[in-house]
Every structure is written in structure tokens, then in C-alpha cells.
Amino acid sequence: MLGMCRGRRKFVAASLALIFIPALTWLYLSSANITVKPLPLSPLDPQSSAVVGAAAEHQSLELRLRDVEEHNNALRREISRTPRVPTHSSHPSSSRHGNQLHTHSTEEGTGDSEAKKGAAAGNSSDCVPQPVVKKCETIHIAIVCAGYNASRDVVTLVKSVLFHRRNPLHFHIITDSIARKILADLFHTWMVPAVHVNFYDADELKSEVSWIPNKHYSGIHGLMKLVLTKTLPSDLEKVIVLDTDITFATDIAELWVVFHKFKGQQVLGLVENQSDWYLGNLWKNHRPWPALGRGFNTGVILLLLDRLRKLKWEQMWRLTAERELMSMLSTSLADQDIFNAVIKQNPFLVHQLPCYWNVQLSDHTRSEKCYKDVSDLKVIHWNSPKKLRVKNKHVEFFRNLYLTFLEYDGNLLRRELFGCPSETDHNSENLQKTLSELDEDDPCYEFRRERFTVHRTHVYFLHYEYEPTVDNTDVTLVAQLSMDRLQMLEAICKHWEGPISLALYLSDAEAQQFLRYAQGSEVLMSRSNVGYHIVYKEGQFYPVNLLRNVAMGQVNTPYMFLSDIDFLPMYGLYEYLRKSVVQLDMGNTKKALVVPAFETLRYRLSFPKSKAELLSQLDMGTLFTFRYHVWTKGHAPTDFAKWRTATTPYRVQWEADFEPYVMVRRESPEYDRRFVGFGWNKVAHIMELDAQEYEFVVLPNAYMIHMPHAPSFDITKFRSNKQYRACLKTLKEEFQQNMSRRYGFAALKYMTVDNNS
């Protein structure tokens, strides 16, 4: 009996071995993601298994696999009979993969860690679909911008947002009068589709926050985010608020969708402050405003405006500010201090954003803990007065990312979106209609098209501050230039002490080169009465007359001296022209005061300080009358022989191809935009002045000297390209016909004179 029991035990043990050993082996081999060397099917090592015959081994394996399959089927039937109890699995694979068979793998471990990261950031969800922004949903962005420097910063911010965006955008910009003028012109000429801009007067909001003492470098404008609920339209429900020193590295729609994650009474979306400022341990006796933990940074804010209004936000922040100012006396970080004080008292208001939505780069931040990889970056915040000079071990990477958008061609952002309906832009519609009417087979098509090209324009690129004199005699020098003429700026500033309006034709990258050049020049930085207006490059021609019109459009004095960048005016010309205004009764007559033009072929010239010195150099061959050897007709009517001995102003008559440099009233006609590049651009303007019955009066003691330079690209094309010259002639004839239609019978003389010549 004992022997029988032992025999049965051996039989059972053998049976179990035959069933479970192959089963475990099969499960091990069928693991999807762990690839290791397969175990032998018998306890023998590979050398001993080689002794077994191949046929017997194959048959044995087949039997074992069949047994394993039958065992698995039995298990499935048993499981199907067991009732399921719904539970919330904490395992990330449960929510991610539903009912899929999931094997343990290294991928699963990664998913688990990612889920933990998401939960820590407040972004975890169990089988809940992630919200998305609708294709054509408009994203609203609010920015406070004041002054010339902030206006430049806004452009870089907007570029980074436009580069990544896939949705229509609506910018709400709170500006002072300076920034409004700059940004209104910029957005108007930028013509980016599916972008709407509203401006709000910061001056009207000053009384709301001026009672708060503020030590922050942003000044009173740094407090205006507090009053957005009152400033922005009452029907606007939510908005993303951004500082001007922000750079986006992702689609802003990803941030917009976070609004869906707000719960309960959460109305503010903020990233935790990444410095120890609010911990009060940066230096001895440092006493910051109250904050929740490390506090929150207000460079990026998600505002639920409708809920804030219901919570009486205005009253809430005012009471908090008044209470804290009794002991703190002033804010150190502007609106951020007050936001944090409110949150300290009402922590339920805040929804904490993951820190990659506001990677703060200042000397005391620990922002490197927010990211391990480039893909982790969403928003970079240069929240230090040092900006790009801030200390950070990864600052070179961040700086390069910032410079990418700083120098990025903004014209490329004019791309159309994917069929989203938008309000009709009449300017864009009219432009497209005009361009469609042009004949693309016309040999002069590119010339004609250039006349209607809308160039992106950034007026007052640098700080400008000047009030015209009260006697109504003030004069602004007007000129235009490209990058290769920058070296003339300092010399002109030394010769002309009055206001200057300059239009610069530059690419985005060249504009930054110019900025660095100007900021490094003591001469240019000492002058606040020079307005620099950037017209961004587009097309193949130099839009010389557009540039002149842009510079003329920013003149705020009664008179303007229409010059060119290659000319140095005589010392004292500014005061001489102002005196001539009174002497010649310019305020009551239509006169164009002619300043005689000369030239030198020497790069180093002892500039004449008087008319006598100039005449001496003229006699010695150091100076010449301008273009005497290539274009005599251009300045011949000035009558240089008479000028040599003249002591009083004298009148001259218009002649064909006359193109003097003149001082006129600010209301004088603009230059005709059809003329681009080289040829007939000034001639046409002088012709129109004559048609409007301006008198040309030569000033006896005024002069200007043209300095030598390499030939421009456009004059080279004019000289070498026959089609260029043919198109210029065609445009000239069309201009003359247009003059006849506008000014009647008297204007026929321009066509007659030209035909005779």
C-alpha cells in the first residue's frame, strides 16, 4: 500500500513536471518585450541535449506545447466564470491600454514614471480623454507694453507665438501712447492672417494703481495686470497674460487647453516661483511679501475673467494690497507681490501649472530642475534686468533659442491658416484685388508689383524724445539708408544737431546688428532726437521712395530737409535753415529752399567750415558740383556760377530732370512709390512740387557735400540691365500721363520738355 502511494506520488509529480515546466517555458518565451536567451527545454545543458535525436526532440516539444495550450484554455474558461468587480487601477497600463494584454517590460516602467510626473504636476487622469483646443477657436492673449524697449521685446514674443500657433489669435495690448503708435503701425503693415489686435490706453488705468509704491524696474505699468478684469471686455471669459520678456517654444494652444483643468474656485493658473525670493533667505534682513511656499511667478498667468469678476477680484486685491502696504510700504516685484499676498490668504484660487510653462532665467532661480531635455521646454522667461546676460549654466542654449526668433524673418509668418473663417480684412482684400489685376506677363511686372508691396514697418526702433521749438521754425533732416551706409550716421549727427528722421531698409537679422551698433556708439546714444524707423526687406528692389515717405511720415516739426544719407550738411545748416524760414516767410508761401550739392572723391576730406573754404576747394579740384560729369542736368538749374557770388536767396525755374535737395513744409507731397531702385525717384518728386506751384529758391550760404562710396546694387542693375532701363522709361511716361490727368493743361509741359530732350 505504501509502495502504491509512493508510486502515485511519483506519477503526480511527473505529470505536474510535464505540465508546468513547458508551460512556464512557453510563457517565458512568449514575453513580448523582454528578449533573452531561451532556456533549454530539459534540465540538460546544451551539450547533453545535442545527444538527443532531432526528431524525438521535435515530437516531445510538440506534445508539451499542446498540453500548455489545453491548460491555458482551461484557465480562460475558469476566469470567464469569475464575476468582475469594477475597480480603479493605480497601474498606469490600465488606463492607457484598456483591455489589451499587457506584459511587464521596460516600457511599462517608463509609462509609470511618466504618469507619476503627470500626477505631480496636476495633470494625471484615469481614462479621461485629454481636452483639446478646437481647430478655429480664438486664443486670447493680454500683454502690458510701454515704451520703446518693451515694443521691441513684444515683437520677439509675438514671433515666437506666431511661429508655433495653429489657431486664430486675439491680442489685447495695454499700451502707453508711444507703444501704441509703434505697435499699431507694425501690426497694420505686418498683415498676419487670423490675428486681431485691440489696444487699451494705459494712461487711463494709471489712477487705478498709481497709489501703490513700486520699486520694480517696470514702474507703474508693472502693476496693470491687476486691473485686467476691469480693462478687458466684459464678455471675455478667459485670457493668457504674458510678460514682454517671454519666448514660446511650443504652440500656445497647449497652454490654453489647461483652462479645462481648473477645478472648484480656481481662477488663476500660475507657475511656482523658481527662486528663493519669497522664502526670505537671499540676504540678511530680506523681508519679502507674504506668499504660499516659494510663491508664484506672474510672467505667465491664466486668468478666468468671468469667475474673477464674480469673486469681486477688484475688491479682493485692493484690500490685500492696502493691508500689506501698511507694513511693507512698497512692492518689490510689482503685481507679483500682490498676487502672491492674495493667494496666501486664498490658496484655493490658484491652479499650479507645471514649471515648464514658465522657465525663469534670473540669477537666483533654480530653473534647471524644470527640464532635463529640450522637449521639456515650453516657455522661457527672461525675468531679470540683465536679460540675455543672466547667469545660468544653460544660458547659451536659451540665448540661441531667443536669437532664433529675434532674427527670424517676420514676413514668413504671414502664412494662411487652414480655412478658419475670420473677419474680412479690407486692406488685405483690396491689395489682393489690385495685385490680381496686374499682368504677370508684363516685362515690368515686378516693378509694378513693388509699388503695392506692404513692407512690415517698425517706427521708432530706438528711444526718441524731442519737442519742436515753439517758434514754428524747426526743421527735421530726412534720409533713408541700407545696412551698407551705417557708417554715415555718426558723421551726420556731428554735422546736424537738429532732429533727424531715418528710414532703414533692413532684414530682421540686420535690424539686430544695427541695434548693437547703435547701442555701442557714444555719438548715437547721446542723441535722443534721432528717429530710426525700420522698414523690413521684401522683394528684389530697394524701395527708395517708400523709405522716404516713411521717414517723412514721422516728422513732427513744421519743416523738413529732404536729404540723402551719403551727404554731409555744412556745419550750422540746421540753424541757417531755421533763420531762412523767417527770412523767406515760409509759413505763408509755398517755397522749396534749395541747398546746393557738391561732391568729393576723397574718403578723407577736410570739411569746409565756410563758403569761402568750399569755393577754394572747388577751385583746387578737391570738390566738384554734384554729378557734374555724369548727370549735369540734375543740378544745373541751381546755377552754381551765380551761387558763387550770391549773397541773397535767388529764385530758379524748374527744368527737365531737376533733382535738388530741398527744405519744404511737412505737408508737401509724398514721393511716388512706383519708382524703386535707381532712377527718377527724386526727379518725379521735384516735378510734382513744381506742378503744385512751389517756388524753388536757392540759399546763397548753404551747401552739402556728397561723400564717396561703392556703387549700390541698384545702380549696377540700371547700368547693366537693358530691361531695367526700359521699365524705368515706361514708368516715367506713365507718371507724366498721370500728372497731366491730375494737374490739367499746365502739366503737359513735363511731357513736352521730355520729348524735346
UniProtKB/Swiss-Prot annotation:
It is found in: Golgi apparatus membrane. The chain crosses the membrane at residues 11-31. Keywords: Coiled coil, Glycoprotein, Glycosyltransferase, Golgi apparatus, Manganese, Membrane, Metal-binding, Multifunctional enzyme, Signal-anchor, Transferase, Transmembrane, Transmembrane helix. InterPro entries: Glyco_trans_8, Nucleotide-diphossugar_trans, Xyl/GlcA_transferase. Residues 76-127 are annotated as: Disordered. Its cofactor is Mn(2+). Residues 139-414 are annotated as: Xylosyltransferase activity. It is a single-pass type II membrane protein. Residues 415-757 are annotated as: Glucuronyltransferase activity. Residues 1-10 are cytoplasmic. Residues 32-757 are lumenal. One of its GO terms (molecular function) is hexosyltransferase activity. The keyword Transmembrane helix applies. One of its GO terms (biological process) is protein glycosylation. Mn(2+) 2 binds at D564, D566. GO terms for cellular component: Golgi apparatus; Golgi membrane. Residues 50-82 form a coiled coil. It catalyses: 3-O-[beta-D-GlcA-(1->3)-beta-D-Xyl-(1->4)-Rib-ol-P-Rib-ol-P-3-beta-D-GalNAc-(1->3)-beta-D-GlcNAc-(1->4)-(O-6-P-alpha-D-Man)]-Thr-[protein] + UDP-alpha-D-xylose = 3-O-[alpha-D-Xyl-(1->3)-beta-D-GlcA-(1->4)-beta-D-Xyl-(1->4)-Rib-ol-P-Rib-ol-P-3-beta-D-GalNAc-(1->3)-beta-D-GlcNAc-(1->4)-(O-6-P-alpha-D-Man)]-Thr-[protein] + UDP + H(+); 3-O-{(1->[3)-alpha-D-Xyl-(1->3)-beta-D-GlcA-(1->](n)-4)-beta-D-Xyl-(1->4)-Rib-ol-P-Rib-ol-P-3-beta-D-GalNAc-(1->3)-beta-D-GlcNAc-(1->4)-O-6-P-alpha-D-Man}-L-Thr-[protein] + UDP-alpha-D-glucuronate = 3-O-{beta-D-GlcA-(1->[3)-alpha-D-Xyl-(1->3)-beta-D-GlcA-(1->](n)-4)-beta-D-Xyl-(1->4)-Rib-ol-P-Rib-ol-P-3-beta-D-GalNAc-(1->3)-beta-D-GlcNAc-(1->4)-O-6-P-alpha-D-Man}-L-Thr-[protein] + UDP + H(+); 3-O-{beta-D-GlcA-(1->[3)-alpha-D-Xyl-(1->3)-beta-D-GlcA-(1->](n)-4)-beta-D-Xyl-(1->4)-Rib-ol-P-Rib-ol-P-3-beta-D-GalNAc-(1->3)-beta-D-GlcNAc-(1->4)-O-6-P-alpha-D-Man}-L-Thr-[protein] + UDP-alpha-D-xylose = 3-O-{(1->[3)-alpha-D-Xyl-(1->3)-beta-D-GlcA-(1->](n+1)-4)-beta-D-Xyl-(1->4)-Rib-ol-P-Rib-ol-P-3-beta-D-GalNAc-(1->3)-beta-D-GlcNAc-(1->4)-O-6-P-alpha-D-Man}-L-Thr-[protein] + UDP + H(+). Binds 2 Mn(2+) ions per subunit. The xylosyltransferase part binds one Mn(2+) and the beta-1,3-glucuronyltransferase part binds one Mn(2+). It comes from the Eukaryota. The keyword Transmembrane helix applies. Its EC number is 2.4.-.-, 2.4.2.-, 2.4.1.-. In the C-terminal section; belongs to the glycosyltransferase 49 family. PANTHER family: GLYCOSYLTRANSFERASE-RELATED, XYLOSYL- AND GLUCURONYLTRANSFERASE LARGE1. Bifunctional glycosyltransferase with both alpha-1,3-xylosyltransferase and beta-1,3-glucuronyltransferase activities involved in the maturation of alpha-dystroglycan (DAG1) by glycosylation leading to DAG1 binding to laminin G-like domain-containing extracellular proteins with high affinity. Elongates the glucuronyl-beta-1,4-xylose-beta disaccharide primer structure initiated by B4GAT1 by adding repeating units [-3-Xylose-alpha-1,3-GlcA-beta-1-] to produce a heteropolysaccharide. This is Xylosyl- and glucuronyltransferase LARGE1. It comes from Danio rerio (Zebrafish). The lineage of its organism: Eukaryota, Metazoa, Chordata, Craniata, Vertebrata.
